[in-house]
Every structure is written in structure tokens, then in C-alpha cells.
Amino acid sequence: MKKETIFSEVETANSKQLAVLKANFPQCFDKNGAFIQEKLLEIIRASEVELSKESYSLNWLGKSYARLLANLPPKTLLAEDKTHNQQEENKNSQHLLIKGDNLEVLKHMVNAYAEKVKMIYIDPPYNTGKDGFVYNDDRKFTPEQLSELAGIDLDEAKRILEFTTKGSSSHSAWLTFIYPRLYIARELMREDGTIFISIDHNEFSQLKLVCDEIFGEQNHVGDLVWKNATDNNPSNIAVEHEYIIVYTKNKEQLISEWKSNISDVKNLLVNIGEEFASKYTGNELQEKYTQWFREHRSELWPLDRYKYIDKDGIYTGSQSVHNPGKEGYRYDIIHPKTKKPCKQPLMGYRFPLDTMDRLLSEEKIIFGDDENKIIELKVYAKDYKQKLSSVIHLDGRVATNELKELFPEMTQPFTNAKTIKLVEDLISFACDGEGIVLDFFAGSGTTAHTVFNLNNKNKTSYQFITVQLDEPTKDKSDAMKHGYNTIFDLTKERLIRASKKNRDQGFKVYQLMPDFRAKDESELTLSNHTFFDDVVLTPEQYDTLLTTWCLYDGSLLTTPIEDVDLGGYKAHLCDGRLYLIAPNFTSEALKALLQKVDSDKDFAPNKVVFYGSNFESAKQMELNEALKSYANKKSIELDLVVRN
């Protein structure tokens, strides 16, 4: 029988990292726990890893504290919004909206969602001096405590606490804010997962260096420049762009080339091709399309070379018949008009003769006016895949119109919202139609809305997880005037409206709750008898404890929790774990549990977790002895955990 109290671990700025070293390189520690550096160097040299003598790092006031924050356990619990989640359109949804501090939410997610997130897109505060970013921290450390836990001297601890408690918008404060969030986010990413971070010039340089430290410089995919505005303000340089920094968990696991099937121009050409092919044939088909192409060519970039059409659609000529880099196949192709062999590519053809004969029979080869032009291969618009350009031209004001469609009653529901088109493009390049897309700075809810749209239009199966702080809307704002008191309320309403426009995909809602197990000694009085009464849980506390435990034990928030009747006692089964939280677990309930293990072929728990505060010591021992000594017919070994 194992006893544990979750979220009670005493962590330091380096304790988790040290534990990883001890687990993977035990030979590098002596019997007293001292690290033997030379042993690790031997392992590295034996693996023929080159040792660099040059290095640099980014340091700031609060870095040790930021690392400590990344390691500390959450100080909250997670609760389900049952009323919302049980609605017909939401009850089977895999999408999640979570209310609360995103650092706390990420900490809760680690056990269940580690290495499961395909893509992260975040739009954190830019720290412009005008966006309202101020670092606030409600953790209550004394200088002495922080000095010990973060491994810093007392003077530095005092200076850190000064800016964390009084509020600051310095570079150091912003880095202290963003570091632990990115650190935990990396743990959630799949090996082939990517993270896209929107930022502007104010923190771009700092963010790049801190990402190098967290994700590894070798896993930097690139930086995108988003040209999203026109700046007519009097200045030396008109600032008309933002940045999107891109990193991956493991670049060796990333596909070598990103291409996207999503293109508005492609869709236009495919539709025009189908329309014209249904109306015209032969020379008239090409003549009509040529006329249309000349009129619209300026709108067709990057497909403004697709000037031909046949019954199969609109196409262009490609020199992909050339063999790249080495000697290819040699044979003659006769020009249909001059009856002479066509000029061959310098290195020959890339296809063998039988493949070329098939392409010729299918009329997929383009000939020039005579034999002096090298043949080309027909490449159809319907097969076009777009590459991700490092420069994105997309008017940021489009987001205002997107929101106006959802909130016609409001002039400006959100400020500085990102456009659906931007996030849609990023997802289409980095993902392949499935996986979890995470946004822990939900804001206007653009990422979640984009996932709804993609799943509806392209029949993809993405799931979003999006997190938003319960932040008040501004006084006299459009949102406040329409009854939305918090950003979360408005984000949730956007997702409700967006879901209705996209096959009612729905979403589930969860929220952080104060940890009711945490007690403050200053609250202890003789009249406050419930201070001692840990066994009395309200229905909300009961459900919150169950939700938090299931997530802590590795179950996704969308995993069903099944009620189990044990002779009138209600237990809960989730992913093979049986939870006993309610009081009054009787001998009859224990007997019913053992009988169910034997007789119910679908009931095969591997662990029993019970709430220690609701089980007297004698009952704990009875349960432990019964499970250890009972030889059930399925030969199941049941682990027993007493949890508080």
C-alpha cells in the first residue's frame, strides 16, 4: 500500500533536471550523491559527440526563479463544467477550453499530455509598454525560502521578489513570465511537434535566445515575417510587420519539407477549370480560359503561370522531366508536328521510356512550337501544394471582419486578434490532418475557431486545447457593454458561435479551482470545526478531486469516467484505475468489489486509489489485506494507493 499527497513535492530550480540525470546516468554519481563530471564526459566521448569550447547564454534577474516556477507543482485543482459538457453538442467533443492561469494548466496537463501535442500556436503579450503586460505573481515566498529553493543569494532573492510582487514590465519580468510556460510546453510536444510563437520587435531577440535554450538551437526551424499592416505614423522606419518564431521538439523527426494543400487560389482555379470544362471543348475551351486568365492573372499569385486548360483541369508546364544532377535516360521523343526528335534535357530524362510512353498516351506532355523546345510535363492546379514562405503578406485587419461576422451586435469584441487565415496556413503546413493543437494564450479564440473551420471544410480531425485567464474586460469596452465581464466569457461565446457554423463540433470546458486541501494556520479557530473535517466534501469538491486525480494519473480530460456500483457504494473507473473517494466504504462494498473483479468479465482494474481522509486507518488496513490476500480468478494484481 503506497501513500501519497499529490502536488506536495518540494522542488528546487534544478531538482527535476537532476532527477533525470540520476535516472539515466546513475554511474555518474557516487554513493554520497555527488556528480562525477568525468564519467559523463567519458560517455559523451565514447559516442563521438563533438565537444564545443564556445558557448553563450541569456541571463537575467529572475532566471533561477523562472526555472523554479517550471518545476514547482500546481497549487490548484481542475474542475469540470458539467452543465456545459453534458449538452448534446458537447458531450462527445474532443475539444477543450480551460479557464485559468496557463502556467497552472500546463502543469496539470504534463502527466497526461506529455509528448501528445502535434502543434502549439501562441500569441503571448508582446511587452510593448502599451499592451498592459505587467508581471504579477501570487506565490508567497520569503527571501530566505526563495534563496534556498532557487539556489541564489539572499540579495538576488530580495530583488526578484520586489519585481514579482510589485509588478514589472521589464525584459527580465517578461522573460521570467514566458520561460516556465515554454519549458513545460516543450514537454507536451510530440517528437515531431512544432511551436509557433507570435512576437514583435520588443521581445524578439530575447525570445529567440530563450527558445534556443529551451528547445535547442539545432531545433530552430526558422522565423516568419508577417507583413500585416501599413504604418503611416511619422517615424524613421515604418514598422509594418511582426514575427513568428518556429521551433520543433526534435528536428530529426520533422519531415524534410512542409507543403500545404490549402490555397484559396488553387481552389479558385480548380472551380474555374471544372466550370469551363463543362461548357466548352477543344480549342474553344483554351480560348475562353485564356481570356479569363488574362483578366485575372494579377489575382492568381503564386499560380499565375497556370495558363493552360484541358478536360482534366487547369495546368502549367513543368521541367520536372529533366533528370537532376546526374545522367538520366536517353531516348527520342518525336514532335507531333515536325516529326523530328525533340531536344533532350542536358542530363537526359528522369523517367524510363515506358513511363514516358504512358504520359504521352495520357496527353500529359506539353510540346513546344517545334522540336527545338524541350518537352514539359503537365502539372495541374488541383495537385498544387504550397510551400511556407518566410514572408507572409496578410492584412491583419481581416480579423476584425471575421469577428464582425460572429458578433454583428458589437463593433470590436477583441483588440489585436489574429486572423483565421494565418493560423489555418500554419496548421496546414505543420500538421497532416490529425493531432492536438494547443494554444495557451487563447485571447480571442482564433486558434480554436480555425480548428473548427479546418475540420468542417477539409474533413480533418484536429482537436484543440485552448487556455484563457479569467481576465476582466476593460471598463467601457464593447465587450463589457454587452455583458461579457471577462475575456474568458467572450472567448467561450465565440467558440459557441463558431461551433454552430461548423457542424456543431462542440467543446468541453474545465477551470482551475483553489486547492481546498490547502490550509492556512491563520484560519484555525475553535469555531471553525470544518477546518479539521477533511472528510466532508461538497459535490463540487468531490467532482474536482476526481477530475484532477484522473488527469494526474495520465488520463486525457476527454477520457470517459465510469461510475461503478459496489453494493450501494459509488466508485469510479477510468483507464483501469478504480477511484474510491466517497466516505462510508463498508465491508459489504469491499465484498462487492472482490465479487465484481471475479464475475464481471469487463471489469479489470489494475489500481485502486482511495481518498485517505475518508477511510479510517482500520478500513485502510482491511482493504489492503483483502486485496493482497484475495486470489481473484483473473490473476489481476491490484496496486493500492492511499491519496490525500
Swiss-Prot record:
It is an enzyme of class 2 (transferase). SUPFAM superfamilies: S-adenosyl-L-methionine-dependent methyltransferases. GO terms for molecular function: DNA binding; N-methyltransferase activity; site-specific DNA-methyltransferase (adenine-specific) activity. GO terms for biological process: DNA restriction-modification system; methylation. Residues 123-126 are annotated as: Binding of S-adenosyl methionine. It catalyses: a 2'-deoxyadenosine in DNA + S-adenosyl-L-methionine = an N(6)-methyl-2'-deoxyadenosine in DNA + S-adenosyl-L-homocysteine + H(+). Coiled coil: none annotated. Gene3D superfamilies: Vaccinia Virus protein VP39 (3.40.50.150). Pfam families: N6_N4_Mtase, T3RM_EcoP15I_C. Signal peptide: none annotated. Its EC number is 2.1.1.72. Keywords: DNA-binding, Methyltransferase, Plasmid, Restriction system, S-adenosyl-L-methionine, Transferase. This R-M system is also called EcoP15. Belongs to the N(4)/N(6)-methyltransferase family. Forms a homodimer capable of methylating the target sequence in the absence of Res. A heterotetramer with stoichiometry Res(2)Mod(2). A heterotrimer with stoichiometry Res(1)Mod(2). DNA restriction requires both the Res and Mod subunits. This is Type III restriction-modification enzyme EcoP15I Mod subunit. It comes from Escherichia coli. The lineage of its organism: Bacteria, Pseudomonadati, Pseudomonadota, Gammaproteobacteria, Enterobacterales.
